[in-house]
Structures are given as structure tokens and as C-alpha cells.
Amino acid sequence: VLGQRLRSISPGIAAILLLAVMFFVIDARVSVAGADEVAQKYRFTELEIDYPEGYDQLPKRNIREVNESYHKIRSWISSVGASIAVNDLTGHGVANSLCFVDVRTNEVVVTYAPTAPAADRFEPFLLDPAPLPIDHTMAPMGCVPGDYNLDGRMDIMVTYWGRVPILFLRKAGTELPANEAYHRQEILPQDSPDGRYHGPKWHTNAATVNDFDGDGKPDVVIGNYFPESDVLDPDGQDNVEMNDSLSTATNGGGLQVLRWHAATAGETPSVTFVPERGAVPFAKSTGWTLALGSADLTGRGLPDMYVANDFTFDALLHNVSRPGRIKFEAVYGERSHGTPKSFQLGKDSFKGMGVDFGDLNANGSFDMVVSNITTAWGLEESNFVWVNQAGSEEEALQSLSAGSAPFIQQARPLGMAWSGWGWDVKFADFRNDGDLEVVQTLGFVKGDIDRWPWLQEMAMSNDNLLSNPAMWPNMQPGDDIAGDQPLAFFARTDSGEFTNITEQLGLDVPIPTRGIATADTRATGALDLAVARQWAAPAFYTNEAPDLGDYLNLRLYRPTLDGTDADLPGTPAYGATVTVTTADGRRQVSQLDGGSGHGGKRSFEVHLGLGDATGPVTVDLRWRDLDGDLHSTTQQLSAGTHTLVLTDRVQEVPNR
């Protein structure tokens, strides 16, 4: 009888034991030995950001007005938009200016970094799109600094929900950034006979800028989330929808590829971009895109692109462009019997939220890190760390040309698989020791009532129901999903694994974050950190690590398009790559990043930590000149900051 009773309850005992094992497994996922010891090597101090005069008097919101069909999920619809960028907006040589979107006011704020010296400070201001048409059905989503008309002056592209991006082109003869110092231009011409906007209703959450066709000029790829519809119009048509699947959605806003065509400088500067139809395979151009990144994986001066999509497959797009024609082909990772389906690059069903390229293992090749939703007991996917398996750029080209992506997914062995509801993610070397850290924004909707059960119930529903917003669970002010998750700061331990030390560093503020930007704002070689928070003020952290290594900081320019202003160092060398070899044989590759990720844009300097390396290092430079000709050179450079002008050769000029 006792044996029968034991047999009858054994399934329950097994289930309890399984749950206990799972608890300890999940607990171990986010706990790596050595976190406290590693954290002692870092230190950050938050500094106050200066705002425009009277900014504190502006009304502050905590929710958006949305289409009536979205009202029941308006907190979900209101969950994005905070973004931040750090760059050299003054033109003085140091990246110590900030541009950020504050969703509380729906304003774009331009100010100086708290670390900026007096000479680089200016009156903070709001970037007003007038006289271009804008109304309550539109909202800014991102700042993307860049020199779009190639005149040597830093411009700003602002992306939006509800319209195409606006370019704020810096006028000649203006000394410091100010609202009146910029000429406004639609990125694509729009007719407005009545002063109202009648153009495409893009809903942009991602942008990357690079020379994609190899002509020496910066092209722009826009990633849109919602399809064209009245998302933010409470009086709009009932034309809105949600994703038609949680894993294979194809009804998103997708990609827009814009090829640089022509530009002028002066008091009314201009630039012309041409839409490049068919640049991306149709099946890869209709996703719910949240992040974009690009890097030259093959050494041809043609950057490949990673597309991070919500609700459907991510995509790695191999660049097969020629001057005047941008073209990408989709490539896929290999899958063995032991590879989970979603760990095959380009075939995953996870929620791609952020992406960055960097040389994680310091072997001279670009790896990739991708944010997903990885909340234990909530929605537990895995972040991606795609480690490059190609032995050389030539081998990478051979694989990609055959349609194969030479990457394997290593997030779990490296300790970065699980963190929370991920968004923007960035590589950076905050200690200058030659090892990259990974910073990731986290959190979704902050409130008081836990709504994870509703979300989990929806995740198990039939895909045929999902596109109708009425079938989604309520998500209103007061509801909470992952609302108390602080950003993650992954640092490498002695074992080679990474561990999240955000709590030890005091960065564990329980507010959802969206964008990350890094820059050497003090010209000391230490990368500072700026963070955009959703429905809260952004934060700026100065890097006070106690024992910094040597570094190489390269400011890379090409001559301006007209070459007339001798007071300007030049225009950023979009697409330039740098490989540094130290005396011990260690190789690191990096690039001038013209803009990547989700809600954050790092500065343009190419920063590499050298650790304890002594003496000059070997620097391999590869770039295209303004005519599109590809050049490369190898030279010795000492540690520190160097300003280099790239033509058909390399000329070092004094740092500004």
C-alpha cells in the first residue's frame, strides 16, 4: 500500500524537485563569482545636467495621447522615445555636447556635458522644428548628430513618430550651437501648401549612418516600428494595428534606405538623399525594427548591417553595393543538431531591441551583442553575443558571399544571457585595459500593479488575434511590467565570464532606461556615460575609475566637400576602421560609428584601451576618400589623442 501511495505522489515530488532545481539554475544565471572584486576597479559619479532656462516650468507628462484603438494599451504605446547622444556640436574638437529627447515634455534638448569647460559651454536650448510642420500627432524619438552636408559643421538629425526625420543643418558663420544656428530641412522633400504635414507617417525607432555604397558619402538607413498609421492621433482613423505574430511578424514599419546624392554649405545649407528602392530584400524590410548597427566585416570598405526586430527574425545583411546603388543580401548562421532554433543567426524568434558591434575577444574581428527580453519568471529569452568565427576578413567575405554568417551565439558561456527587458546596448572600454565592457538599458513600463501574468497569457494566445489592439490585455497608467529594472553593466571577471556589477557601482536606479551614449568628454582618455530614461530625466556619469590604462583616441576626418573653410578640421570619416596591435601581439578593431543601436549615439572618436602596453602601437587604418577610393596604411602611433585628416594619405594635425 505504501509503495502504491509513493508511486501515486511521485509525479508531484518530481515536479517539486524540478522547480527547486530550476530556481537554483535561474539564480545562478545572474550570479557570477568575483563581482565585488571586479567592481572595485570602476567608479562613476553622477553630475547634474543643465537645462534651458524655464525648462522646469514646462508641463511634464507620464503618458502619451494615442489613437482611440490603442487607448487600452496606451502605456505600452508610450514605452519608447527617450534617447541621448554625445558629440562635438561646438566644433572645438572635444565631444562634450549633449542632445536628448525628453518624453515628459516631447522636446529635443541640446546642452553641454556637465564636464565641459567654459569655452565649450553655450546656452542650453530646445531644438524647435519650426517653420517645418509638426503637430500633436508627432513625437521626437531620437537625436543623430552627424555632418550630413559634409561642410565640417556638426548637424543633427531628429527622428520622429508620425513623420519623416528632420535635418537640422548647421549654418556657416555661427559660433556656438543655438536654435537659430540650424537650417531645417526634411530628409525627403515634402509638399506643405497649407503649412501642415502631408508626408509619410514613419514611426522611427532606429537609425544608422554609414557609407553603404562606397562613394565616400554618408548614407542613412531608417528603422520604423509601426506601419504608416495614426498612432499618436486621438482623433485619427481606425487604421492602426499591432504585430501579426509574436515570432514571425511581417506587418511592421520596416526599413527605409536613403542614399546620399548632393549637398551645399553656407547660410542655407542643404543635402539631398534619394530613396533606394529594393536595397533590402522584401522579406527583411517589413519588420518591427527597434535597432540598427553596421560595420565592415569583410575589409572592402562596405559596411554590413544588423537589423534588430521586435516580434520577428533579426537580420544580418551582407553589403553587395556599388557606388550609386545600395544593395544588401540576407545571410544566415549555420545550425547543428545542438543549436537551439533561435540561436541560429537570422532565424531567431526573440525580441531584438538593441545591437552594437565591437571586438569582444580582442582578436581583430567584429563581434555583435544584441538585447532581447530576458526576465526570469516573466519572458525569458536570451541576449545574443554573436562571436565572429572567421579567421580573417577574407574568410568572412567568403562565408558571407555564400550566404553563411560566421557567428556563434555565446551569451550564456560569457555570462551575459540574462539581464531583464533589454533595449539599447553598447560596447565600451571604461578602464582602458583592452577589455570591453557591455552596458545595457533595461525596463519596460513602471507602475504599481504587476501585469506580467496578463502578458504571459497574451504570449500563449493565437497569432491570428494579435494584430487587433482590442485583443491585447489592458496596459494603463499604474500597470507595471519590468518597471524597476536598472541598467546592466557587464564587466569581465578573472574567469573570462562577465558579471553585472550595476548594483556595486551605484547605477541601479529602478527606472526604465532606453539610450546609452559614451564619449571622452574631458579629453583625458576616460569614457563618460550618458543614459536616457523613459519618463524621467536623463543621467550623466563621469568615469572616475581608479586605475586607468593607456589609450588611443583617434579623431578621424576627411576634407570638407568644398574644402574652403580652413578653420574646420574636416568632416567625419564615416566607415573608417582602425586595427591596433600592441607589442604583446594583441589586436583590437574598432570603427568610426556614425550612429547605431536603439536610443543612444556614441561620439565619433575611435577609442581603444591599451592597458599596460608601453611605447608606440601599430595602427592599421582603412578608409574611403570623398571620391570613394579605398585606402589603407600602417603606422606607429604613441598613446593618447591624435587628430588625423585622411585623403589619399594620413596627415596628423594638432588637436583642437
Predicted segments with their positions:
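Repeat-based blade/solenoid architectures
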Residues: 53-83, 131-143, 190-208, 251, ...
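Hydrophobic or amphipathic alpha-helical targeting/insertion segments
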Residues: 14-19, 145-175, 183-185, 199-228
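Beta-propeller blade termini
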Residues: 80-91, 110-111, 139-154, 203-218, ...
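Short, conserved, GDST-rich strand-edge loop motifs in beta-rich repeat architectures
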Residues: 224-250, 371-378, 444-481, 562
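Beta-propeller blade repeat segments, especially FG-GAP/WD-type strand-to-loop junctions
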Residues: 34-38, 106-127, 164-186, 232-247, ...
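Hydrophobic beta-strand segments that make up the repeating blades of beta-propeller
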Residues: 96-102, 143, 153-160, 220-224, ...
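Gly/Ser/Thr/Pro-enriched helix-cap/hinge segments flanking short amphipathic alpha-helices
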Residues: 2-75, 79-83, 482-485, 492-493, ...
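Repeat-solenoid scaffold signature
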Residues: 201-212, 216-221, 348-449, 511-548, ...
